[in-house]
Amino acid sequence: MSADRAILHSDMNAFYASVEMMLDPKLRGKAVAVCGSTENRHGIVLAKSELAKRAGVKTGMVNWEAKQRCKDLILVPPQYDQYLKYSKLAHEIYYRYTDLVEPFGMDECWLDVTGCEIYGKPLEIAEEIRQSVKEELGLTVSIGVSFNKIFAKLGSDLKKPDAITVITKQNFKENIWPLAASELLYVGSATTKKLASYGIKTIGDLAATEPSTLKYMFGINGLKLWRYANGTDESRVMQKDFVSPVKSIGHGITCTADLDNEEEVLHVLLELSQDVGHRLRVHGLAATGVQIFVRNKSLYSTQYQYKLPFKTQLPSEIAAAGFQLFKEHYIWTEKVRAVTIRAIDLIPQTTEEQLSLMVDYERRDRRVRLEDAIEDLRRRFGKKSLTYAGLLGNLKMPDDGRDSVKMPGLMYQ
């Protein structure tokens, strides 16, 4: 791999569950699931141990179904502060070799070790990292070693747990092309279904498809898919301090229990929009569009978007637009498992806008002053110092005190 880039992708195996078992020796060697609500039988499995996985427990299952699959399953509540702590400790190990470390969630990272021969060959560096994480943190990782980010990520998925997989220009067709197209990063259920309708079922099928056909199907993203499948992705691993240009701002969660009705969905959207509105203000941006992403209890995902008649930073307006989208499009055949709301088509807040006869600007000005005051109070006294009365009580959301890790936005669903 000396003539190529050397990219590693490190994935901490069954991360939440592994941290719990490392912290509590009584859990080791047992089937464990981390759940948003351990008391509620309709709580959701957020992560599971390897033994639980072998018994058929899946992330996103409700508690009672997981217990049916695995009678000896032990349910534990999440400790987000501990997960963040061990995520940061793993990152410190990665930084011993390179400052080109790009997080992909709390438990995954890309590392560019091109030109780092002083530490050994890429495979040797991967082996050192694997051993260091195990010895110093008591956790295991699977690492993919390849010449681009996409194949490195696939490599880390191929062997689990505690393993290393090398994908080269010489062997990727043999190892990668037979895999289902859905295994490719950023390809979700809707894209997989559309590809299948054209007879494209494997990554190899995707690689052999004419780029013009994929562009017709998915626009510019279709060409990216073709490059990913053919191993020609050249996207860089970003330096640890790199901040990408803000193209959209969103917030989403997997609920601790399934949402049963529109009122519960509205409350979740309003709570998520508080964070979105705050971050828009921090960046000095305003949204001219809103997008929502909804996953049902069968883990089928859909997304919808709407062009706003005005620019906004207001959480209430962002949530209202998202809720309108939900009411117009979501069919209640199943309960809702996860929700994301995103501010899109961003412009500088200082951008002049054309006035519309359809907007009550006097009412909007009052709302702006109110939410400015709320933002100021939260900045001075903390996020929980003031909230809407409708957001009190059980929102079926994870503990608000958790730390979150930024991730690249979903490209495909």
What does each of the following model-derived ranges do?
Residues H9, E183, T191-K335:
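DNA-contacting surface of Y-family translesion DNA polymerases
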Residues M1-R227, V237-K240, H278, R364-Q413:
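Gly/Gly-Pro- and Ser/Thr-rich, intrinsically disordered tail segments characteristic of DNA damage-repair
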Residues I74-L75, Y300-Y304, T351-E352:
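Short small-residue beta-strand/loop micro-motif enriched in glycine and branched aliphatics
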Residues F104-E108, S146-K149, L285-G289, E334-A338:
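Short Gly/Ser/Thr- and Asp/Glu-enriched loop/turn motifs at secondary-structure junctions
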Residues C109-G115, Q303-Y306, E353-V359:
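Short, hydrophobic beta-strand segments
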Residues E317, F323-R380:
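C-terminal hydrophobic structural anchor segments
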Residues F15, T38-R41, K297-Y300, L346-Q349:
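Short, charged/polar surface micro-motifs in flexible loops or helix N-caps
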